[in-house]
A protein has these predicted regions:
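Negatively charged, low-complexity tracts enriched in Asp/Glu with abundant Ser/Thr
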Residues: 1-35, 61-62, 93-95
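Low-complexity, intrinsically disordered short peptide segments enriched in small/polar/basic residues
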Residues: 15, 37, 49-50, 70, ...
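Mixed-charge, Lys/Arg-enriched low-complexity segments
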Residues: 4-8, 55-95
Length: 95
């Protein structure tokens, strides 16, 4: 289950919350910067090896792929923002 502090760390001006399914321990968000979609799923570290698994898909794609594994929600948010910065830089360099 996500704590109130973890949910607060998901900045609503940077992310659009698509859905939050507390029973399944995941939150689906969209980056307003890149328009990419993300699922932050909390799981059993004994099973997954990490407490949080991050899934990703681009706009127009149907399925998510496993993007990263993290130790906490702040690390997850940082990973998403880093991906957005990379995508923005790559897009700028492709012009």
């Amino acid at each position: 289950m996500f704590t109130k502090r973890e949910l607060k760390s998901i900045n609503k001006s940077y992310f659009n919350v698509v859905r939050y399914v507390s029973e399944m321990n995941y939150i689906e968000i969209q980056s307003r910067c890149s328009k990419d979609y993300w699922i932050i799923q909390k799981g059993d570290p004994a099973y997954y090896g990490y407490p949080i698994i991050l899934y990703h898909k681009h706009p127009g794609q149907q399925y998510y792929h496993r993007h990263w594994q993290c130790y906490n929600v702040n690390q997850t948010i940082s990973s998403i923002k880093s991906h957005d910065a990379y995508k923005k830089l790559r897009k700028w360099n492709d012009k």
